[in-house]
């Protein structure tokens, strides 16, 4: 399964913020520059992460962003479920767009459903804290 850039950027933002002190405010430009990502793309991502409670945004001259929850409370599987548009691996997963004549008898859909469930089950076992265990190395690479 391939994650969208939107989800990739969401996870990268969370990783970046998790390597900072909990009260430290970061601006979007710093994140964009560290990852060589468009600031405009990140603004959309951060807005959504804020609505979901993963980040806290503070407006104004001395504003910025920081994690809205402790890293150990941010589940990777949950983040991915919130940021991915859909999990329609193949056409038959989408009832409205399914035109495959094999759908009524096909065993592939069942196999792919099991694979998707296993994929998400693994992601559910990890938190942001697990992902940033090597914070010192991450900080070096991001600076």
From Swiss-Prot:
<dbReference type="InterPro" id="IPR036390">
    <property type="entry name" value="WH_DNA-bd_sf"/>
</dbReference>
<feature type="binding site">
    <location>
        <position position="100"/>
    </location>
    <ligand>
        <name>[2Fe-2S] cluster</name>
    </ligand>
</feature>
<keyword id="KW-0238">DNA-binding</keyword>
<dbReference type="GO" id="GO:0003677">
    <property type="term" value="F:DNA binding"/>
</dbReference>
<comment type="function">
    <text>Nitric oxide-responsive transcriptional regulator.</text>
</comment>
<feature type="domain" description="HTH rrf2-type">
    <location>
        <begin position="2"/>
        <end position="133"/>
    </location>
</feature>
<feature type="DNA-binding region" description="H-T-H motif">
    <location>
        <begin position="28"/>
        <end position="51"/>
    </location>
</feature>
<feature type="binding site">
    <location>
        <position position="106"/>
    </location>
    <ligand>
        <name>[2Fe-2S] cluster</name>
    </ligand>
</feature>
<keyword id="KW-0805">Transcription regulation</keyword>
<dbReference type="Pfam" id="PF02082">
    <property type="entry name" value="Rrf2"/>
</dbReference>
<keyword id="KW-0804">Transcription</keyword>
<feature type="binding site">
    <location>
        <position position="92"/>
    </location>
    <ligand>
        <name>[2Fe-2S] cluster</name>
    </ligand>
</feature>
<dbReference type="GO" id="GO:0051537">
    <property type="term" value="F:2 iron, 2 sulfur cluster binding"/>
</dbReference>
<dbReference type="GO" id="GO:0046872">
    <property type="term" value="F:metal ion binding"/>
</dbReference>
<dbReference type="GO" id="GO:0005829">
    <property type="term" value="C:cytosol"/>
</dbReference>
<protein>
    <recommendedName>
        <fullName>HTH-type transcriptional regulator NsrR</fullName>
    </recommendedName>
</protein>
<keyword id="KW-0411">Iron-sulfur</keyword>
<dbReference type="InterPro" id="IPR030489">
    <property type="entry name" value="TR_Rrf2-type_CS"/>
</dbReference>
<dbReference type="GO" id="GO:0003700">
    <property type="term" value="F:DNA-binding transcription factor activity"/>
</dbReference>
<dbReference type="InterPro" id="IPR036388">
    <property type="entry name" value="WH-like_DNA-bd_sf"/>
</dbReference>
<dbReference type="InterPro" id="IPR000944">
    <property type="entry name" value="Tscrpt_reg_Rrf2"/>
</dbReference>
<keyword id="KW-0001">2Fe-2S</keyword>
<keyword id="KW-0479">Metal-binding</keyword>
<keyword id="KW-0408">Iron</keyword>
């Amino acid at each position: 399964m391939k994650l969208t850039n939107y989800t990739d950027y969401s996870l990268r933002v969370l990783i970046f913020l998790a390597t900072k002190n909990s009260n430290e405010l970061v601006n979007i430009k710093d994140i964009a520059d560290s990852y060589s990502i468009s600031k405009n793309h990140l603004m959309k991502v951060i807005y959504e992460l804020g609505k979901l409670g993963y980040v806290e945004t503070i407006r104004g001259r001395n504003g910025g962003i920081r994690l809205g929850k402790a890293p150990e409370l941010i589940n990777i599987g949950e983040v991915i479920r919130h940021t991915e548009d859909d999990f329609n691996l193949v056409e038959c997963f989408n009832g409205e767009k399914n035109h495959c004549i094999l759908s009524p008898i096909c065993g592939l859909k069942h196999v792919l459903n099991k694979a998707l469930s296993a994929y998400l089950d693994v992601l559910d076992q990890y938190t942001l804290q697990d992902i940033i265990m090597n914070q010192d190395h991450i900080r070096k690479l991001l600076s």
